[in-house]
Regions:
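Short flexible/disordered coil segments
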Residues: 107-110, 216, 221-226, 291-294, ...
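Long, contiguous, secondary-structure-rich segments that constitute the structural scaffold
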Residues: 117, 121, 125-172, 244-260, ...
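Extended redox/cofactor-interaction regions of prokaryotic respiratory oxidoreductases
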Residues: 1-83, 93-103, 109, 173-269, ...
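Glycine/threonine-rich phosphate-binding loop and adjacent beta-strand/alpha-helix elements that clamp
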Residues: 95-120, 130, 135-137
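Catalytic alpha/beta core of large soluble enzyme barrels
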Residues: 89-90
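Catalytic, metal-anchored helix/loop core of enzyme active sites in primary metabolism
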Residues: 86
Length: 355
């Protein structure tokens, strides 16, 4: 049994306090770092994230980092924010470490094991080891009662009468018999809906009581200014967020992104497929150059690009300078007052031919 953690402190990002729903609101940490309200933030630990491709308004994010006394980064790659760090702890890759059990309860429940194929190379360490050692040095050893990753995993597996050896004998995956989602609710007579009425609520009294509109109302977005397009972004089946663009095999499959432009709009601008342009948003932020993909598969008032490209980190030798970064062009965002979520498709760009 772990000891209770600290309680009572107001969350600086407003999650579950300023915002009625939402586990975290990362972009809302930026202003408290700068203003010191509701309390000063002096240090930041960045684990497995490319900060400059994650949080909107990059200039504001950099201003926040300049206010901090200490930045610790833990990663497997020399990401764009790494040069801003005071200390960098290189983590072992997924092939060199244990990770937590992957447990899914869906139609076919299963438990899967990820264990190292080789020992960690160079001076890298697994993330669990870093957390435990840092906790021990801070006098928090009671929160880390396990000496090894195997000990922790065996403790978890013991709740269902398994251990690592048994799991390995089954190929690293335990598949259990599933059951219909509603079976447990039907057996007890309970409702599957976690609402005050235990029914589907189209009208929310909880939202009304908190001062929000109890029924969703459509709020139109601003239209693009003359000469601009709404910036849309999305994912690629080849890459994972902004983390895999430097991976040799994946880089070979998709070395850079392209900007989708409606073919009629491209014709009007005198642009041809494959021609390279810079993107400049409504606040003057730029990214590129990026190749044009003229296509009928997008609205005439929008452009689209795959997220995760346009890296500035020299250590990312393959990805460095390839394509454009949608994150650099997201200097504005719309804040959802209920969840704290950030709507990022409220930025507009114009296309400037590369000279």
């Amino acid at each position: 049994m772990l000891p209770p953690g600290p309680t009572g402190k107001v969350r600086a990002d407003g999650a579950r306090q300023k915002f009625l729903r939402g586990a975290t609101a990362m972009q809302e940490l930026i202003e408290p770092m700068i203003t010191g309200q509701p309390y000063p933030i002096k240090g930041l630990v960045l684990y497995g994230t490319n900060l400059f491709h994650t949080v909107p308004n990059l200039p504001r994010t950099k201003a926040a980092l300049q206010k901090l006394d200490f930045i610790l980064s833990i990663d497997v790659l020399p990401q764009d924010h790494i040069p801003w760090s005071d200390v960098v702890l290189p983590e072992a890759t997924y092939l060199e470490r244990y990770d937590d059990l992957w447990a899914c309860g869906h139609k076919t429940p299963y438990i899967a094991l990820r264990e190292p194929a080789i020992e960690p190379l160079y001076q890298t360490k697994p993330g669990w080891w870093m957390a435990r050692e840092l906790g021990r040095r801070l006098g928090l050893e009671a929160f880390f009662p396990w000496q090894t990753a195997e000990g922790y995993l065996n403790q978890r597996l013991s709740s269902i009468g398994l251990d690592l050896d048994q799991l390995r004998k089954q190929g690293g995956v335990v598949i259990q018999k599933g059951k219909p989602y509603l079976a447990d609710f039907e057996a007890t007579g309970a409702s599957p809906f976690n609402t005050p009425s235990k029914k589907v609520e189209l009208y929310s009294k909880a939202l009304a009581g908190a001062g929000f509109k109890p029924l969703p109302e459509y709020e139109p977005s601003a239209e693009p200014p003359a000469g601009f397009f709404r910036l849309l972004y999305g994912r690629s089946p080849v890459h994972t967020f902004a983390r895999t663009q430097n991976t040799p095999v994946l880089h070979e499959l998709q070395p850079e992104n392209a900007v989708w432009v409606n073919e009629a709009a491209a014709y009007r601008l005198g642009l041809k497929g494959g021609e390279r342009v810079w993107l400049e948003n409504q606040d003057g932020a730029r990214s590129g150059p990026i190749a044009v993909k003229a296509t009928p598969r997008i609205r005439p008032d929008c452009v689209y690009m795959v997220h995760g490209f346009g890296h500035d980190a020299p250590g990312l030798s393959r990805a460095h300078g390839k394509g454009a970064s949608d994150a650099k062009l997201q200097t504005r965002y719309a804040l959802d007052p209920i969840s704290g979520g950030a709507g990022l498709r409220v930025n507009f760009v114009k296309l400037i031919r590369e000279t």
